[in-house]
From Swiss-Prot:
Assigned protein family: Belongs to the AIR synthase family.
Protein name: Phosphoribosylformylglycinamidine cyclo-ligase
Source taxon at top rank: Bacteria
GO molecular function: ATP binding; phosphoribosylamine-glycine ligase activity; phosphoribosylformylglycinamidine cyclo-ligase activity
EC code(s) of this entry: 6.3.3.1
Stored NCBIfam families: purM
Organism for this UniProt entry: Bordetella avium (strain 197N)
Highest classification ranks of the organism: Bacteria, Pseudomonadati, Pseudomonadota, Betaproteobacteria, Burkholderiales
GO cellular component: cytosol
Keyword Nucleotide-binding: yes
Main subcellular location of this protein, as a coarse class: cytoplasm
Length: 349
């Protein structure tokens, strides 16, 4: 006769379902297969993934980036919207390495949860695969960690890792930026993946519901719109205009005010004009509902601009035309000026 202290235990008894993990892998494989590109020698299923750097690079420099989705995940849990946060995950890393001129080559993800829901995880990974397709990189591997007791049921965390390559002579570092250069902005799709702690606080104050109407769309669709991936459009502009594109800034945490200075040398400032772009309705509503000051908006949110380019003044119109031909909404935000005493490196007038 056995009792509860002598009965054989299994991993499932401890909260880890190996069969569910295997079922997820089976769901993931065809999703990853859609992202395959030249260079992949071995992908999902092995102990390590293999990728051959394309031979078109004479002096390739590898560029890597890692990021998560932040507290936007809290809304994904609360509003049961899991199919787009994977796109966010890819976008945050590939847009980051793009600013140095890198072509994203491959991507890996880390999915951690307390109890694995195959359907939820497959929805997330489906978004990751879609993001990789948009970025032209291969989903080459990843890790799913089921850790009982570490996360509440229905919740998970994500991390992503992107690796790209750029020709050594084509690295974009902002060192050639000078007074008179023009600042261009590419439209965002919404709040992207930053500022969501404040977004959630404002939603709570406003008593907002995911299904309420917001200018003809459910609020959930507007708030959870996935981060735009700028890779193919910007790479096309770089291929055509080369060194005339002097600097790129991905507008993430810190908004316009903290991210544009990251590509500027000492002694330079970016002067942006508030009438240079239209702030989307979402940000107008967030500012009104939260009584958020203008400066706070610019240092928390992208305010409608997801990527900034600093370009040679005599090429600004041509570069804008190339980007518009790629489907981008381009705004002329301002220009680079000498930094005066007490002047911020980025300011809006």
């Amino acid at each position: 006769m056995t009792n509860e202290h002598s009965a054989p235990l299994t991993y499932r008894d401890a909260g880890v379902d190996i069969d569910a993990g295997d079922a997820l892998v089976d769901r993931i494989k065809p999703l990853a297969a859609r992202t395959m590109r030249p260079g992949v020698l071995a992908g999902i299923g092995g102990f390590g993934a293999l990728f051959e750097v394309p031979k078109k690079y004479r002096e390739p420099v590898l560029v890597s980036g890692t990021d998560g989705v932040g507290t936007k995940l809290r809304l994904a849990f609360d509003w049961n919207r899991h199919d787009t946060v994977g796109i966010d995950l890819v976008a945050m890393s590939v847009n980051d390495i793009l600013v140095q001129g890198a072509e994203p080559l491959f991507f890996l993800d880390y999915f951690a949860c307390g109890k694995l829901s195959v359907d939820t995880a497959a929805a997330v990974v489906g978004g990751i695969a879609r993001g990789c397709e948009l970025a032209g990189c291969a989903l080459i591997g990843g890790e799913t960690a089921e850790m009982p007791g570490m996360y509440p049921d229905g919740e998970y965390d994500l991390a992503g890792f992107a690796v790209g390559a750029v020709e050594k002579t084509a690295i974009i570092d902002g060192k050639s930026i000078q007074p008179g250069d023009v600042v261009l902005g590419l439209a965002s799709s919404g709040a992207h993946s930053n500022g969501y702690s404040l977004v959630r606080k404002i939603l709570e104050r406003a008593g907002a519901r995911p299904d309420q109407d917001f200018h003809g769309q459910p609020l959930v669709d507007v708030v959870m719109a996935p981060t735009r991936i700028y890779v193919k459009q910007v790479l096309a502009a770089l291929a055509e205009h080369g060194t005339a594109i002097k600097g790129l800034a991905h507008i993430t945490g810190g908004g316009l005010l903290d991210n544009v200075p990251r590509i500027l040398q000492q002694g330079l400032s970016a002067k942006l004009y508030r009438d240079g772009w239209q702030m989307p309705q979402l940000f107008q509503w967030l500012q009104q509902q939260g009584a958020v000051a203008d400066t706070e908006m610019y240092r928390v949110f992208n305010c409608g601009i997801g990527m900034v380019l600093v370009v040679a003044a005599d090429q600004a119109d041509a570069i804008s035309a190339t980007l518009r031909a790629q489907g981008e909404a381009v705004s002329r935000l301002g220009e680079i000026v000498p930094q005066q005493d007490g002047m911020a490196q980025t300011f809006v007038v």
